[in-house]
Amino acid sequence: AQNRLSWNNYIVWLPCRAPDGSFFRQKGLIPMSRDVSVGYLNLTTGGILKQAFKCLGDRYGWGGMLESRDCSSYIREVYRCFGWILPRNTTGQLQMPVRKIELAGRCCSEKEQILRALEPGTLLYFPGHVMMYLGYENDNFYVINDVSRLVKEGETMPVRVRSVIVNTLAVRRPNLRTWMEELTLALIPWET
């Protein structure tokens, strides 16, 4: 806030680190045109999707590299806006005591039938990756996720995406199996 009036700004306290490593806080200003919420947002499907789409195009960073997020921390941060503290990685998320639907061992048509009944915002997993289900249209099933690489439909070589994107479950992993084929679990954080 250095030498600025707070007109049309929210005044916030920012945690800072002094040169000697000690903690101090400093006032900061956030323009009123930006998203600010005092407390957690109300958990609604629309709210979850709105928060998820605010990150569209953000850079991927495995384990927080490049001051960025990977798939599990992206999902964690979206749900944190609603007061849900999810574990940092997919292994921990899979152990949460919430409603789970096993998809491993099912054929794609069975998985599609299950997905049609799920609400947007449901989390979908395959080994090493989590994504947020958006819904389906014209037999295409859509997700939003923070992804490093994938094989585009009709191609055989992986491309480095390294971004938050929307894609269908028809894209492939480097092993050339579709994401639909690879799905192992649906997790609904708001149901126990």
Residue ranges and their predicted role:
Residues 1-2, 124:
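Generic structural signal for buried aliphatic residues
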Residues 2-3, 135:
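Short, low-complexity Ser/Thr-rich regulatory SLiMs
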Residues 4-104, 127, 140, 144:
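N-terminal capping segments
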Residues 21-22, 34-38, 133-192:
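Aromatic- and glycine-rich peptidoglycan recognition patches
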Residues 24, 28, 111-119, 161:
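Glycine-rich, flexible loop segments associated with nucleotide phosphate handling
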Residues 87-155:
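...with weaker cross-activation on analogous glycine-rich loops/strands in unrelated enzymes
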